[in-house]
Amino acid sequence: MCLNKCALPDYLSEAGVVAVIIKPAKGVMFMLILGCLIVLAALFLLVKRYEARMVLVCAGIVMCLASGAPMKALDAFAKGMGSGMISSACSSMGFALAMRFTGCDKHLINALAKLLLKVNWLLIPGVIFGTYAVNVALPSAAGTAAAAGAIFIPILMGAGVHPAMAAAAVKCGTYGSMLNPGLAHNPFVAKIAGVNVMDVIAFHYKANIASLIVGAVVLTAIAYFLKENKGHVVEGLELDTEFKVNPLYALMPIVPIAILILGATKMVPVFKMGVAQAMVIGAILTCIVTRTNPAALTKSFFDGMGKAYGDIIGIILAAGVFVAGMNAMGLVKAFIAAMTNNPSIVKICASVGPFLLGLITGSGDAATFAFNEAVTPHAADFGMSIVQMGSMATLGGTLGRTMSPIAGATIIVAGIAGISPMEVTRRNAIPMVFAMIIGMMFLAF
């Protein structure tokens, strides 16, 4: 009988192979089947929108207990709490909350809105690109949907665009955070690959922009085909045309990004620094420019950091426990062995898997973090680089979430437009599928 060593779980030693030969791998097969059932149960609960962190942690602990190695789950949890990406994710969200507190995000959005109103025929693609730009600076899909949607959706509806199409245009641009160094997935992949976070963004930015252009073109074409680009009058809609944009306030949200880009490209060598340092500098400059109470701004910054630890780092910790459970059951080794024997499916798994999970759960984070921690470190075995595979998984999960009817950002824009979230998904489905295909072509070849 041929045994694939890669399929053996951690609890089997080299000598354990003898036992497997004597008892034709019944124990191994039982553990693999049990592990698969637990994973499927976890996926079912995620689809049913149970608390993602609870589901992942519980599933990981159960798998570790079943394998006879309960401490592996706790060790993974403890290890994750000291993760190097905490500073990037937390400082980024702290800065985003500081921008909301000072109102600088509104100045940036209104500045973009005034430009869009001057070119009426570019309203829909312009809103998509504008929302994307806002999301680059403020890396929260739901936060961007709320901030940008409150301005852009009324502008589009006031110009005669169908409410559902207006909401879909904003939602289509809510994955600009892929280009933000503070997005947790970027430093996560960078850490695995042993490279700088800006190196990861430099690798996938062309794919992101290409996917955005394709998505914007397809959605605009759908709007023209359905005749939803004009002629839909909404009574009682009033735009805040009196809002006065302060150019300095509007520039504040992009200060950290500008510092990081100028430093990483060595255009201004003194600006070469980490994400956390850039975010703190941005917050300090914002405090000076807006003359905000320093104590109040500091509180909002740290409130954002705490929210990031609970929401973003929490999912990373939970995904680590889940992966520890899969490792203990032998699922990861079996999966890697299967892909090693069929390398042609790896690129499909890396993108389509997180995309589908993002679509059906409303969040691509859990699936993407789990995939990147379990499989991406072995990218070289499949003829891919770690950054390449990690970027494919991240973009796939992000686009799936952008298309999902149960994502927080979808629900927010639908509420602003006064329509059903499914109406947003119906219009965004085809653009996001095309965006994924083009994006993956850029990353895979």
Predicted segments with their positions:
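Short helix-coil transition sites and intra-membrane helix breaks within transmembrane domains
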Residues: K48-A52, S83-M85, L97-K106, N135-A147, ...
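Core transmembrane alpha-helical segments of multi-pass membrane transporters/permeases
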Residues: M54, A73-K106, A276-V280, I284-L331, ...
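Hydrophobic alpha-helical transmembrane segments
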Residues: L32-C36, M54-V57, W121-F129, G143, ...
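Hydrophobic alpha-helical transmembrane segments of multi-pass integral membrane proteins
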Residues: S88-S91, K118-I153, I316-A319, N341-P377, ...
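Membrane-core helix-loop-helix motifs of multi-pass transport proteins
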Residues: I153-L248, A409-F445
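Long, contiguous bundles of hydrophobic transmembrane helices that form the permeation core
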Residues: A15, I22-V39, L56, V62-S67, ...
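Membrane-interfacial loop-to-helix junctions in multi-pass transporters
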Residues: M29-I33, M81-I86, L112-F129, G158-A166, ...
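Re-entrant/interfacial helical elements at transmembrane boundaries that shape
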Residues: H107-N110, A142-I155, L183-G194, D365-H378, ...
